[in-house]
């Protein structure tokens, strides 16, 4: 018999990681005018693979972080800017806003899938 956590699948882990990423992205946006602030992010794919116990991650783009590096240990990575500012700040507002919007949408999707999974489990428990 599998546990309740197993029944939720990867969605519960994804929500936690999306929240962590959301906090990093909002911190980046809040510090957009702070001199020498370095934009941070996590490698979501590597973190999710680590959290789910699957150590292999497929990268489809050259800009993806390699698995097994700092992100695999749960550390935030520094993002390399396309055009760094003169004051050493690496936050690019357009990039941060786009990443924030995408992360929020994916968070909501994971939440909806998790809610659907829980509703299905409740239906099975009630015997309806």
Curated annotation (Swiss-Prot):
InterPro entries assigned to the protein according to its UniProt record, in alphabetical order: Flagellar_basal_body_rod_CS (IPR019776), FlgB (IPR006300)
Localization (cell): Bacterial flagellum basal body
Any GO BP annotation: bacterial-type flagellum-dependent swarming motility
Keywords: Bacterial flagellum
Superkingdom in the source lineage: Bacteria
GO cellular component, one term: bacterial-type flagellum basal body, rod
Membership in a protein family: Belongs to the flagella basal body rod proteins family.
Function (record text): Structural component of flagellum, the bacterial motility apparatus. Part of the rod structure of flagellar basal body.
Subunit structure: The basal body constitutes a major portion of the flagellar organelle and consists of a number of rings mounted on a central rod. In Gram-negative bacteria, at least four rings, L, P, S and M are present, whereas Gram-positive bacteria lack the L and P rings. The rod consists of about 26 subunits of FlgG in the distal portion, and FlgB, FlgC and FlgF build up the proximal portion of the rod with about 6 subunits each.
Protein name (Swiss-Prot/TrEMBL): Flagellar basal body rod protein FlgB
Species of the source: Cereibacter sphaeroides
């Amino acid at each position: 018999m599998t546990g309740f956590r197993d029944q939720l699948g990867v969605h519960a882990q994804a929500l936690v990681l999306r929240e962590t990423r959301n906090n990093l992205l909002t911190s980046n946006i809040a510090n957009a005018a702070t001199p020498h602030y370095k934009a941070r992010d996590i490698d979501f794919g590597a973190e999710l693979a680590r959290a789910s116990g699957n150590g292999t991650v497929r990268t489809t783009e050259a800009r993806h972080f390699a698995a097994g590096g700092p992100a695999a240990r749960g550390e935030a990575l520094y993002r390399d800017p396309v055009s760094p500012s003169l004051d050493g700040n690496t936050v690019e507002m357009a990039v941060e806003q786009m990443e924030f919007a995408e992360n929020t949408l994916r968070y909501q999707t994971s939440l909806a899938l998790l809610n659907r999974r829980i509703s299905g489990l409740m239906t099975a428990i009630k015997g309806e």
